[in-house]
Amino acid sequence: MKKSPLFSIFLIVLVDVLGLTIILPLLPFYAESLGATPAVVGMLVSAYAACQLIAGPPLGHLSDRVGRRPVLLVSQMGTFAGFLMLASARALWMVFLARIIDGLTAGNLTVAQAYISDVTTPENRAKSFGMIGIAFGLGFLIGPAASGYLAQFSHTYPILAAAALSLTSVLCTYFLLPAVAPHPTPETEQGRPSRWSAYIESFKDGKLGPMLWQFFAFTFAFSTLFSGFALFAERRFTHNGAPFGPKEVGYVFAFSGLIGAMNQGGGIGSLVKTFGEGKLVQVGFGSMAVGFALLSGSHQITFLLVAIVFLTFGSAVLRPSLTSLITSRAARHRQGMVIGLMQSLMSIAQIIAPLIAGLLIQKQYLSMWALAGSLFCAIGWSLIATTR
């Protein structure tokens, strides 16, 4: 395993995640300031995910054919353009357009995961994917806190900061990331099988198929949480007599990032060696289910933070373990295709979950919103036996 490309991709993912997490706690409040209801906020998040669904698989296939680095650069430049559009938005349609632009080019993390698969061995892959978990942890620690601080002065400042980070990510990829040889499919010269045929084959695989459904269940639960949490917290919690706003939500996300960084900081490799990836998937789903259940009944900040600990720990061990299991099962020349399929499943979950979350929160069904996340964790848990 080469350390220099892994360090470079870690740095790039970190900068990308910082931009994402700066936007995350702000976007619902930014949209509300332009007249959006919770249901419309859900539609906004879903529109971004729908564009990812359209663009994700082709980007994965393209990265298999031409290499990860060129596709990563195009994705990052699209994100930069989307953030600039968002910062200049003065009406809801401009916010939607900005998120659509970003969504259509949002292959950053997909291609980064494929790059990690290219430069690691199966034995070290889970630990290497844990680096993405560390990047997410650090991003959630720094980004939301910075967003909450900057939003006190103007809702535009955090978005401009995210745009600057996106431009930095482009420069890091161009100057720091070594190119790796593409992995075109062996059928290229004789005619490639269709994308849908490859997807169907993946779902028919006795072990890979259930793992893909587990990934969908995890992503649905995760999307339920992060698409609706800001609006949920605004209606459920107060600080100094005022409802939660971008600052408070940003600090809660930062707390989540701290827990995630503590769990991922060198710990995922030892946990995999001790318990195995399958066991960590089981623990992850269980921990997240408990966290959602606690969140459904919490009215005090203390219980909120306890719920966040369970949710963050669960996702921190589940995401890299399940991703490693899926990519290890896939043939080397189809790594990009399988990860593109995972991106599609993620996008489908991210289309549906925010719509449901927005409607539930608009109807003031706050506890039901949290229990929906717990339900999908239970579904993911129920699929564990079929993957053994």
What residue spans do the PLM features occupy?
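Residue-level signature of mid-helix packing/kink "hotspots" within the transmembrane helices
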Residues: 21, 49-57, 107, 140-141, ...
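Helix-to-loop junctions at the C-terminal end of transmembrane segments
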Residues: 56-67, 263-277, 361
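Juxtamembrane intracellular "pre-TM" segments in multi-pass secondary transporters
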Residues: 2-3, 179-213
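Structural signature of the two symmetry-related core transmembrane helices
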Residues: 70-85, 279-294
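Short amphipathic helix-loop junctions that connect adjacent transmembrane helices
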Residues: 25-39, 228-248
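Helix-breaking motifs and short loop linkers at transmembrane-helix boundaries and internal kinks
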Residues: 35, 67, 88-93, 297-299
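Helix-loop-helix hairpin linking two adjacent transmembrane segments in secondary transporters
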Residues: 131-175
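Cytoplasmic helix-loop-helix junction between adjacent transmembrane helices
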Residues: 98-137
